[in-house]
Design a protein with these regions (language model features):
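A short, conserved, highly charged catalytic patch centered on acidic carboxylates
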Residues: 1-121, 125-142
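Extended, non-transmembrane interaction/recognition domains
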Residues: 99, 147-150
Length: 150
């Protein structure tokens, strides 16, 4: 069955219009742009990284937290986990195929490759023709500890 990724991405963007802080192609921050540009690509080689949607919201105390969102429009492409339940990004193909894995890849690039941001939120969105899934993952340090919330 073909992917409906673009349609799902547009639905997600429509929901985020209230935030007025999201983008796909524009810069949200030079340091984050450099981190995404210089990190290994989702395929494992060199090249830039392009999250489907980027947010840069501020907390009540005006602390900004980068949010990377990856959308997949093929049913069953939300997340790939290891037998222990952790997100499995050991294979580039899993980073490319699964929404959460791709979003975590981007969040990881920010946490590892910036001085200012040691936490990031990864969001995977997956919807097939008749089902919808969303997963948030909070990245908080370079040791790759994460906490997932359905």
């Amino acid at each position: 069955m073909p992917s409906i990724e673009e349609k799902i991405e547009n639905i997600a963007k429509e929901q985020l219009k209230k935030c007025r802080t999201f983008t796909k192609t524009e810069s949200i921050n030079a340091e984050i742009d450099d981190a995404l540009k210089n990190a290994p690509s989702k395929s494992g080689g060199k090249g830039s990284n392009y999250p489907d949607i980027k947010l840069f919201p501020a907390t009540k105390s005006n602390r900004k937290i980068p949010v990377m969102i990856e959308v997949k429009g093929t049913k069953g492409a939300l997340i790939k986990t290891a037998p222990n339940g952790e997100i499995d990004n050991s294979k580039p193909s899993d980073i490319q195929k699964y929404a959460v894995n791709g979003a975590v890849h981007y969040a990881d690039a920010i946490v590892k490759n910036t001085m200012s941001y040691k936490e990031s939120v990864a969001v995977g969105v997956n919807q097939g023709r008749d089902s919808y899934s969303l997963r948030f993952t909070w990245y908080s340090d370079p040791e790759q500890r994460s906490e997932s919330h359905n």
